[in-house]
């Protein structure tokens, strides 16, 4: 917003001298034709209508009101429609572009070659008075305050969607505008630097590494006959931080390799390092693969070949009432004769000789 230049509003006053501060008299008619026709460049200027004897625009001064004269014939129409279509003010009066009434106030506002009452210039969205604002914006003949203009027509970041202000650092890519911090890889979230290669896929920025990964994913799915979209081929932040473990290829053995290892297993199921090295040289396999094969074979052998255990009947509880005290005749003895068991042999001979006497003796519980 700027004040109109003093020389732009010098009025030719009949019967009065043009002051020394103004331009010469012969230049005044040409300037008068520019008073109502010069664009305001999207800014509102507070103008004193008429300048009295001095003929200068002075928003802070006071004087008699005189109309401006023009050297060129002006349109007699003073309706709001004619003013909105770009016509200049008719001689002798100025019409407000908002209410259509003649402006007889001491001050007026001039925006984009149109005249306004100070009270009539307002935002077309929020209806805020712009009489004391330093600037205003025009779009399709509508007046906006700064806030509403940027809300409706301002540039937004293609990543975060927030407004980009004139003081923000930005990066541009294929017509898209990004905040400096928002110009980062979609997959790894790393901010890209100047001169670094990047790709723009469906409005998403990718660094070179993850762009190649996306192409590999698309190629692999096409080869497998699976349909996949570009969105599905993109790696997300979770996939980057927690990648899925790659499946290990299963090791296959030839008949000759199996024959060599099985022959060694029959001799020694837990070979040492030297034997493993010899087997690796003979079979062409790595020591680690052979060692794992022997571990698996030992586990299978231990599982299928277990020591023989005698089968026993399940033990069941018997009520104590059904139990009877054991009798001597129910007990079977087998004599164990060691090499120096002479005394034990004599004892057993004595017990056999007096068996009848023992059978007739009563049995008493031990107290």
UniProtKB/Swiss-Prot annotation:
InterPro entries for the chain: HD (IPR001356), Homeobox_CS (IPR017970), Homeodomain-like_sf (IPR009057), LIM_Homeobox_TF (IPR050453), Znf_LIM (IPR001781)
GO-annotated molecular function: DNA binding; DNA-binding transcription factor activity, RNA polymerase II-specific; metal ion binding
Domain LIM zinc-binding: 96-148, 157-210
Entry-linked SMART domains: HOX, LIM
Main localization (coarse): nucleus
Keyword DNA-binding: yes
UniProt keyword Lipoprotein present: no
Domain of life: Eukaryota
Biased composition, class Low complexity, residue ranges: 68-79
Protein purpose: Transcription factor involved in differentiation of certain neurons and mesenchymal cells.
Example of a GO biological process term: forebrain neuron development
Region (Disordered): 44-79
This protein's name: LIM/homeobox protein Lhx8
């Amino acid at each position: 917003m700027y004040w109109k230049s003093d020389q732009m509003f010098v009025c030719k006053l009949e019967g009065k001298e043009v002051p020394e501060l103004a331009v010469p008299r012969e230049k005044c008619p040409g300037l008068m034709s520019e008073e109502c026709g010069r664009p305001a460049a999207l800014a509102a200027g507070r103008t004193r209508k008429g300048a009295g004897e001095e003929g200068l625009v002075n928003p802070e001064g006071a004087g008699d009101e005189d109309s401006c004269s023009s050297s060129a014939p002006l349109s007699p129409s003073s309706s709001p429609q004619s003013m909105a279509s770009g016509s200049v003010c008719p001689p002798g009066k100025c019409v407000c572009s908002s209410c259509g009434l003649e402006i007889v106030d001491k001050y007026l506002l001039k925006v984009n070659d149109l005249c306004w009452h100070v009270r009539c210039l307002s935002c077309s969205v929020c209806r805020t008075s712009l009489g004391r604002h330093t600037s205003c914006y025009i779009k399709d003949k509508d007046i906006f305050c700064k806030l509403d203009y940027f809300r409706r027509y301002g540039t937004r970041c293609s990543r975060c969607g927030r407004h980009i202000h004139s003081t923000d650092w930005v990066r541009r890519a294929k017509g898209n505008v990004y905040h400096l911090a928002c110009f980062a890889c979609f997959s790894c979230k790393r901010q890209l630097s100047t001169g670094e290669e990047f790709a723009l896929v469906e409005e998403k920025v990718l660094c070179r590494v993850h762009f190649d990964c996306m192409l590999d994913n698309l190629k692999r799915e096409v080869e497998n006959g699976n349909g996949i979209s570009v969105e599905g081929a993109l790696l997300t932040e979770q996939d980057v931080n927690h990648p899925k473990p790659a499946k290990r290829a299963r090791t296959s053995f030839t008949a000759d390799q199996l024959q060599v290892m099985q022959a060694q297993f029959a001799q020694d199921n837990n070979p040492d390092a030297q034997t493993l090295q010899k087997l690796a040289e003979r079979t062409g396999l790595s020591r680690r693969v052979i060692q794992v094969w022997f571990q698996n074979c030992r586990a299978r052998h231990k599982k299928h070949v277990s020591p023989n255990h005698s089968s026993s009947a399940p033990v069941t509880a018997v009520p104590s009432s059904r139990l009877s005290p054991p009798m001597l005749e129910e007990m079977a003895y087998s004599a164990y004769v060691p090499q120096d068991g002479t005394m034990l042999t004599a004892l057993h001979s004595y017990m056999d000789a007096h068996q009848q006497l023992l059978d007739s003796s009563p049995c008493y519980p031990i107290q």
